[in-house]
């Protein structure tokens, strides 16, 4: 890729518009997780230290275009940024036609999704964004898969368009995991449905040496292998698809190991009685809610021997203590492994937090949908636009 990096530019005296992902959860006007704000700070500080006139924007929620609403305002974000940076960060409304900002100053531009034309990547709006700055910096990997005016259109028209440190770190880590991975490459893909991860499974099966499936996805593969899954969540209409994925893996020498034992319950409840069973001993009224200890040990061994691990999804109902042991075993194995590891997806990050292994994971992707689309081999609009500008 030939993307211009913000870190290679001299921003002194330049008007710099930075698209961040500051879409933080807010309840009753209070920010409940400020991870995305703190992640953006090094980028903002670097631009300020170089003497740039810094404008930052982000989306928050899904406001109606053309309508300002307090619920979707970045006001709480501006306040928190002011506290973290130790300087006033003014929030600017109605900013599309011009922003008054001086070198060494930083302003936050109100929720870009309130601007008419943002969602449809409107060309006229994109040109107005571009006219605000000398340099546009795309630093919001979490929205890189959306072709919108602030993530795509502006890149086409800004005098200079660059990838920010957060975005580039994400792309560098993903490239290390997928383009030239240390072998063996092991992927863990889990979730409730094969249908939502079908493209991901099909893409990864052409790249990985081992593919561990978990959750409802694993149940479909277990059923495809001819075992009873009882009342477990699975997709009977995708059994042939699961068989094909297994066959495709085998054809290129890759392996999709199935659980040898599982943890079952009669009800989907936090206090349900958990019972470990061999995979061929699941009863008609059983729910499979986790992998069993033997399987967890086998998978942990694969992780220990891996050169690269890509983790997307917990392998059991880890929110329920009795059914969290499988996910914990894999999390601990990733933490102690020497492999280059990358973890992404909301539930995965919750598991990383629950088992307190963030410091031991090589790279934690905050991308969500963009992370999945990249793993699926899709071209991300923002990345493609930056690449075209850098060519």
UniProtKB/Swiss-Prot annotation:
The keyword Transferase applies. Pathway: Carbohydrate degradation; glycolysis; pyruvate from D-glyceraldehyde 3-phosphate: step 2/5. Substrate binds at residues 21-23, 36, 59-62, 113, 146. GO terms for biological process: gluconeogenesis; glycolytic process. Gene3D superfamilies: Phosphoglycerate kinase, N-terminal domain. ATP binds at residues 197, 319, 345-348. One of its GO terms (molecular function) is ATP binding. It catalyses: (2R)-3-phosphoglycerate + ATP = (2R)-3-phospho-glyceroyl phosphate + ADP. Its EC number is 2.7.2.3. It is an enzyme of class 2 (transferase). The keyword Cell membrane does not apply. Pfam families: PGK. Its main location: cytoplasm. Keywords: ATP-binding, Cytoplasm, Glycolysis, Kinase, Nucleotide-binding, Transferase. It is found in: Cytoplasm. One of its GO terms (cellular component) is cytosol. Monomer. HAMAP family: Phosphoglyc_kinase. Belongs to the phosphoglycerate kinase family. This is Phosphoglycerate kinase.
């Amino acid at each position: 890729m030939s993307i211009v990096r913000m870190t290679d530019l001299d921003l002194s005296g330049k008007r710099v518009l930075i698209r961040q992902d500051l879409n933080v959860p807010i309840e009753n006007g209070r920010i409940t997780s400020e991870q995305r704000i703190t992640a953006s700070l090094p980028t903002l500080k670097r631009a300020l230290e170089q003497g740039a006139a810094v404008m930052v924007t982000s989306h928050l929620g899904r406001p109606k275009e053309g309508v300002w609403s307090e619920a979707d305002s970045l006001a709480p974000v501006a306040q928190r940024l002011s506290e973290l940076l130790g300087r006033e960060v003014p929030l600017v409304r109605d900013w599309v036609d011009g922003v008054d900002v001086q070198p060494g100053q930083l302003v936050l531009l109100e929720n870009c999704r309130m601007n008419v034309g943002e969602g449809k990547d409107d060309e006229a709006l994109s040109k107005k964004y571009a006219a605000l700055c000398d340099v546009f910096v795309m630093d919001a990997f979490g929205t890189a898969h959306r072709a919108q005016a602030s993530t795509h259109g502006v890149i086409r028209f800004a005098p200079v368009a660059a990838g920010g440190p957060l975005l580039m770190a994400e792309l560098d880590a993903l490239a290390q995991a997928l383009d030239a991975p240390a072998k063996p490459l092991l992927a863990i893909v889990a979730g409730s449905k094969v249908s939502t991860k079908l493209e991901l499974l099909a893409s990864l099966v052409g790249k990985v040496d081992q593919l561990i499936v978990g959750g409802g996805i694993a149940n479909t593969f277990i059923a495809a292998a001819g075992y009873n899954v009882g009342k477990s969540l699975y997709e009977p209409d995708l059994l042939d698809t699961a068989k094909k994925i297994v066959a495709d893996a085998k054809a290129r020498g890759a392996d999709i190991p199935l659980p040898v034992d599982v943890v079952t319950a009669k009800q989907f409840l936090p206090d349900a009685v958990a019972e470990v069973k061999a995979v061929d001993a699941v009863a008609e009224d059983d729910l499979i809610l986790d992998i069993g200890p033997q399987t967890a040990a086998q998978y942990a061994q694969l992780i220990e021997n891996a050169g690269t691990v890509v983790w997307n999804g917990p392998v059991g109902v880890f929110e329920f203590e009795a059914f969290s042991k499988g996910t914990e075993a894999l999390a601990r194995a990733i933490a102690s492994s020497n492999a280059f590891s990358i973890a992404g997806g909301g539930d995965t990050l919750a598991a990383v937090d629950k088992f307190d292994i963030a410091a031991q994971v090589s790279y934690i992707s905050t991308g969500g949908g963009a992370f999945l689309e990249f793993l699926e081999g899709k071209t991300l609009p923002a990345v493609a636009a930056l690449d075209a500008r850098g060519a």
